[in-house]
Amino acid sequence: MMIQTAVAQAKTAPAGPGPWSIKDLVDLQYLDELMSIDNLDVWFCSLVGSIAIGLSGIFPLLVIPIEAGTALKTEAGCQKLKKLLSFAIGGLLGDVFLHLLPEAWAYTSSPGGSHRHYCTQGLWVIGGLMSFLTLEKMFPDEVGDPETKTSFQRTTSSSSDLSSQFSVSPQTNGICSNNNSDSKPKTDISPYTQPEKIKTSGYLNLLANCIDNFTHGLAVAGSFLVSRKVGFLTTFAILLHEIPHEVGDFAILLRAGFDRWKAARMQLSTALGGVLGACFALCSQSQHGAENATTWILPFTSGGFLYIALVNVVPDLLEETNPRNSLLQVLLLFSGIGVMALLSIAMD
């Protein structure tokens, strides 16, 4: 009330320098409206909904029992990971063509208008794909150095040669003896092993997820600006859509070299994108502001997901030579698309 009175007085006062200008008072009024009781409820519900969607990143821990490291290097672990990757490819393709792009088209479609916006969104898809290609070119995965590999083999061979010079006889009570030197205890030499390098594709997938969560935050906050009922329904629909998507993303992170717990932590960190998206929509205080951002963010994210699915993950599946495993991978790919199709139909 005090701010409204001050604004009215400022409008009737003669123009001239003073401690308060009309612009300053209007900004104060905007902040007062932004932090009103009704808006605080919208802020709370939007942030809680965005965080809940981000917490879906830990769901794969409950359904993926395999471990990274030695388990994934076994034949059984490798086949399990390839099955998850097949489902991940289907989920990503279904997400792009059945959810992200149709939603972007719905924001920009206008009856009787030009179709130039479709070309613009197509360019954003290409831009997202090329951006991820550029990032992977800038930060390529390091291939093992032949010289390092040779020195490692030389170290192990010299260690075995050193061990072969000694022999253990019963007369020495377990003490190594040698004809050319005095008796000495046997020395165990073990080569140094470096930790596994995380592939760039894992970080690209996290970047795409962060941008995708930003759009989810925009949708959640924009829905709560309409009404609490619409907001809760939108949050629930996004959660249903995200659960199979997170399982596929988790498999991609395991393939990139993350262990299960680190992959879960990195998935949770992408929830920050959803919080930022919700804050952006609430600060704009308009659905139109969120929609304008969504019209280019959704196709850009689609290009990133297409790059991850078709460039980073599909080549691993093409290495499969067993016809039975190949057929199973194709069926899982279609099942991933089918799950996304059912969820898209259910959300309409």
From Swiss-Prot:
Catalyzed reaction equations: Zn(2+)(in) = Zn(2+)(out)
Family annotation (Pfam families): Zip
Ranges annotated as biased composition (Polar residues): 170-182
GO cellular component: cytoplasmic vesicle membrane; endoplasmic reticulum membrane; Golgi membrane
UniProt superkingdom: Eukaryota
Residue numbers on the Cytoplasmic membrane side: 1-45, 105-118, 241-262, 316-326
GO BP terms in the entry: intracellular zinc ion homeostasis; zinc ion transmembrane transport; zinc ion transport
Lumenal side: 67-83, 140-219, 284-294, 348
GO molecular function, one term: zinc ion transmembrane transporter activity
Membrane-spanning intervals of the chain: 46-66, 84-104, 119-139, 220-240, 263-283, 295-315, 327-347
UniProt biased composition (Low complexity): 149-169
Record keyword Transmembrane present: yes
Subcellular location: Golgi apparatus membrane; Cytoplasmic vesicle membrane; Endoplasmic reticulum membrane
Annotated segments matching region Disordered: 144-192
Bilayer topology annotation: Multi-pass membrane protein
Keywords of the record: Cytoplasmic vesicle, Endoplasmic reticulum, Golgi apparatus, Ion transport, Membrane, Transmembrane, Transmembrane helix, Transport, Zinc, Zinc transport
Residue ranges annotated as motif XEXPHE-motif: 241-246
Record family assignment: Belongs to the ZIP transporter (TC 2.A.5) family.
Subunit (UniProt): Homodimer.
Function: Functions as a zinc transporter transporting Zn(2+) from the Golgi apparatus to the cytosol and thus influences the zinc level at least in areas of the cytosol.
Protein name, per record: Zinc transporter ZIP13
Gene: slc39a13
